Regions:
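Conserved beta-strand in the GNAT
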Residues: 55-57, 63-72, 226-236
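A short beta-loop-alpha structural element at the N-terminal edge
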Residues: 2-25, 163-190
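Active-site rim helix/loop that mediates acceptor-substrate recognition in acyltransferases
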Residues: 28-55, 191-217
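A short, internal acetyl-CoA/4′-phosphopantetheine-binding micro-motif in the GNAT/acyltransferase core
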Residues: 85-100, 244-256
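Conserved acetyl-CoA-binding loop-helix of GNAT-fold acetyltransferases
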Residues: 97-111, 137, 253-267
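Conserved GNAT acetyl-CoA-binding A-motif
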Residues: 113-126, 269-280
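Active-site/acyl-donor-binding loops of N-acyltransferases
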Residues: 138-158, 271-323
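A conserved beta-turn-beta hairpin within the catalytic core of GNAT-like acetyltransferases
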Residues: 73-87, 236-246, 297-298
Length: 323
């Protein structure tokens, strides 16, 4: 079996494999879960080659039997500058040895990413995904769980909103980063955004890897009590996708529930469904939304592989001078 970079002549075969996997997923998953996968960087989110991606194919006896695709993080980043890559797709053709092909593709991508100077590879997979062993055996480890909650008709429980609410301002960014560090376990923040600069690069995707919504009306507020203790961003959809709610909140008293109610109030007279992507450590927000008509749509595993260890710059000491 030969692993090589994908070329234009491979596109028809790649699209055929992707459609086949697409059909299987559509038959197995609820429509809303399928839509989430299409709009996020969940494994199976094929990006066109016009975007900045790495794509490699596995070839056996002259026939393409699998492919893998990765992009810079955030999506669209020039790959020459990317130090973090997101695996977007891994497909193996029907009838091929899934373990052998997937393992070889993941190994090749890891080696190529390291040669390009990447520090880490991320991937998100639905739980119980059959391709999970291919990543685990190549050194990927789970660092978080993503929970997507969904409601056909979300309902507020109260019009009592948090004290200190105000619209977000450009100058809030550093305080928002401090809030992110407070609510995120250190093991996660050190992987995803160990510095303010890296957090800013990921902020557009709200730390979920979700593709930016088009044709949506966005509203963003913070809860300011000298320090920021809460943040909510609402994207009211003008198309077929559900409205989107994003949250950060300290797990203090009534704050999660009040922030959830305020977020729902920003949807106005929308009668469509809504969803929100949260992490396992956001259990206070998950519980608050469950009490307002939401239920778990799907659970995804977030995995990472460290390609190169970061070595802190050694501090210069004072050396006595003689003579």
């Amino acid at each position: 079996m030969n692993i090589r970079a994908a070329g234009l002549l491979d596109l028809a075969r790649i699209e055929e494999m992707h459609r086949s996997a697409d059909i299987r997923l559509s038959e197995a998953a609820p429509p809303a879960a399928r839509l989430w996968s299409l709009l996020s960087s969940t494994l199976s989110a094929l990006l066109p080659l016009t975007q900045e991606t790495l794509m490699y194919v596995a070839e056996d006896n002259g026939k393409v039997v699998g492919f893998i695709q990765a992009s810079g993080q955030p999506l669209g980043l020039d790959l020459r500058r990317a130090r973090v890559l997101q695996v977007l797709n891994l497909q193996v053709a029907d009838g091929s040895d899934s373990d052998e092909v997937a393992f070889a593709l993941v190994e090749h991508l890891s080696n190529q990413a390291l040669e390009r100077g990447a520090l880490r590879l991320f991937v998100r997979l639905p739980d119980r995904d059959p391709l999970l062993p291919a990543f685990r055996l190549r050194g990927f480890r789970q660092y978080a769980t993503e929970v997507v909650v969904y409601a056909d008709k979300p309902a507020m429980r109260s019009d009592q909103f948090p004290d200190g609410l105000r619209p977000a301002r450009r100058g809030d960014n550093r305080m928002l980063y401090q809030l992110y560090r407070k609510v995120t376990p250190q093991g996660v923040s050190q992987l995803e955004a160990p510095t303010y600069r890296e957090w800013r690069a990921l902020h557009g995707g709200e730390w979920t890897g979700r593709l930016a919504a088009r044709g949506s009306d966005k509203l963003e507020h913070v809860v300011d009590r000298i320090e920021l203790v809460g943040w909510v961003k609402v994207e009211r959809s003008s198309g077929a996708r559900p409205d989107t709610l994003n949250f950060l909140a300290l797990p203090e008293g009534p704050l999660p529930g009040e922030l959830a109610d305020f977020g729902l109030s920003l949807l106005g007279d929308s009668e469509g469904p809504a969803w929100s992507s949260l992490r396992h450590y956001d259990s206070h927000m998950i519980d608050a939304l469950r009490g307002r008509g939401f239920s778990v749509l799907l659970t995804q595993l977030l995995l990472v592989k460290e390609l190169a260890a970061r070595v802190p710059v050694q501090e210069k000491g004072l050396v006595p001078s003689y003579g």
